[in-house]
Swiss-Prot record:
Transmembrane segments: none annotated. It comes from the Eukaryota. GO terms for cellular component: cytoplasm. This is Probable serine/threonine-protein kinase fnkB.
Length: 530
């Protein structure tokens, strides 16, 4: 807090911006916290609770980020708090959109990149904005930067937390994320939903709302739950931009992309460095699966134990893995027999090698995991035994064992299988899968065999044009699609073969730009990005 005592005669009101917010001149050259300035924004807040100067405290925390509006200081008396904020000579993003609509996507990508980097910076420090909208973004003509302003609804918390303990419902109509409407916790991912709404407004779209479902249950007034809505993405947005926005709108907060992952989204590279888009897409998928499914809400800092490769053939017994271990990693050559008590009950993530590359092939008895609440399991190609049933498993990576797709729990959200599926998938056994990776499966896609929750599908080879035409059997939930095909088949694939729900597609390791065009006869080979 500043030692300055507010005096009305020190300030000349130049303009009333909104209720109790003014542009003022510093008549007597008051210096606040070493800050000299001629003009500023003065916010006057009637003291009703102990957090009336919260915005000043938050801005002080963010003072070293040059894309955030500065706070010069604040002071209080018995009834009122006065906050002195940097005056930005420029215009709001709302004004810019109204004047320049439609904004070319190249320029949109530059603005979006600036803003998502600003958001990542405040999230890293431990601040959520909670009121991102066009009028709360300003272009500063002096610094030539877009800046986030108005942190009046912001919340500050420990950067080590995934979210905050802020349960208050606030924000602008149409921007409010599902978790807040449901009375839940507000965190970093809430800002991501709101950011997606902001991008829609940048496109000139309206926040028209369409009912969605969460965990298969429709929320409406008939079951005493708040209405849950997802904004409609303007159809004129390019497919890459649509995909960016889709990543902001996962209904379940933990599954939503975070600001760091969004910085690497291919839409932001489309106009400057197309050559690395394949790498960015693949890295983004892996990071998303690792953070949101493999390590979903699990605190592993200082609780990881890696067992190095060795030639020991003796059984792997109790006492080797430290008590309290949460993430247990065996290197790929490990193939000792595990005996009851060797896996601590605290283990939630268990890896044998990396995605198919492991020598481990010992039977895993149920007794081995009696007290474990395993959430993630990775097994390699060598594993040939029946998979035990793990009722809480969210992430499962399996080698090419043909019998391994048994005992799958309904809790699975990521399923990686490096064999060839011999029978149709039973979608009822995996009703919540978001990521389905079966890259060595060489069959056509049969209707009703891909769960309607899948967002990312990595298929194997579609051997001919007839198989390509089975892409129409994909559920509309699939946004990201990867598959391979013979070169002569690739040359024949047209835009009409790809479902409209697909916004990112990789074929034979080529990133293809799906044009928004009425010309369904366009060949995909003519739109290779990299």
């Amino acid at each position: 807090m500043n030692s300055y005592i507010y005096k009305e005669e020190d300030w000349e009101i130049v303009e009333t911006l909104k209720s109790n917010v003014f542009k003022v001149n510093n008549k007597n050259n008051i210096v606040l916290n070493g800050n000299s300035f001629k003009t500023c924004i003065l916010k006057i807040i009637i003291n009703k609770d102990k957090n009336v100067w919260k915005e000043g405290q938050v801005l002080e925390k963010l003072k070293n980020i040059d894309s955030i509006v500065k706070c010069y200081g604040w002071c209080c008396n018995k009834h009122t708090t006065y906050i002195f904020i940097e005056y930005i000579n420029g215009y709001t993003l709302e004004e810019y959109v109204l004047k320049n609509h439609p904004i070319p996507e190249k320029e949109l990508s530059e603005i979006i990149e600036d803003l998502i980097k600003s958001l990542a910076s405040i999230h890293e420090i431990g601040v959520i904005h909670r009121d991102l909208k066009l009028e709360n973004v300003m272009f500063d003509k002096e610094s030539n930067k877009w800046k986030l302003i108005d942190f009046g609804l912001s919340f500050s918390f420990s950067p080590s937390n995934d979210g905050s303990k802020c349960y208050t419902q606030c924000g602008s109509i149409g921007y409010i994320p599902p978790e807040i409407k449901l009375g839940g916790q507000c965190g970093r991912k809430s800002d991501i939903w709101i950011f997606g709404c902001l991008v829609i407004k940048m496109l000139g779209g309206e926040l028209e709302e369409t009912e969605i479902q969460i965990d298969g249950a429709s929320f409406n007034n008939n079951n005493n739950k708040p209405n849950i809505w997802i904004p409609k993405i303007p159809p004129h947005a390019s497919k890459f931009l649509q995909n960016f926005i889709q990543k902001c709108f996962f209904e379940e907060e933990v599954l939503r992309f975070d600001s760091i992952t969004l910085i690497d989204h291919p839409f932001l590279s489309l106009f400057k460095s197309k050559g690395n888009m394949l790498y960015l897409i693949q890295r983004g998928h892996k990071r998303w699966m690792d953070i949101t499914q493999k390590k979903k809400g699990i605190k592993i800092e200082g609780k990881t134990f890696t067992f190095e490769d060795n030639d020991n053939k003796e059984p792997f017994g109790p006492g080797i893995v430290p008590d309290g271990t949460v993430e247990l990693i065996f290197k790929k050559t490990f193939n000792q027999r595990l005996i009851p008590g060797s896996i601590p009950s605290t283990v939630q993530i268990l890896d044998f090698g990396v995605d198919g590359d492991s020598f481990f092939n010992q039977e895993m008895d149920d007794d081995l995991f009696l007290d474990c609440d395993l959430k993630s399991l990775t097994l390699g190609n060598a594993f040939t035994h029946t998979l035990p049933y793990f009722g809480s498993l969210c992430y499962l990576s399996l080698g090419r064992n043909r019998n391994a797709l048994q005992n799958l729990p309904p809790t699975l959200e990521t399923l990686k299988y490096y064999g060839e599926v011999q029978t149709d998938l039973n979608i009822k056994s995996i009703p919540h899968v978001k990521n389905l990776l079966i890259p060595f499966n060489n069959h056509s896609i049969i209707i009703d065999t891909i769960p309607p929750t899948v967002k990312y599908l990595a298929w194997g080879k579609l051997k001919d044009l007839e198989a390509i035409e089975t892409l129409k059997n994909l559920p509309p939930s699939v946004n990201d699609l990867t598959f391979s095909c013979p070169p002569d088949v690739f040359d024949k694939i047209q835009r009409k073969h790809i479902p409209d729900s697909i916004s990112i597609i990789i074929i034979n390791q080529h990133v293809i730009e799906l044009k928004n065009s009425d010309n369904s006869e366009t060949y995909l080979k003519d739109n290779i990005v990299c």
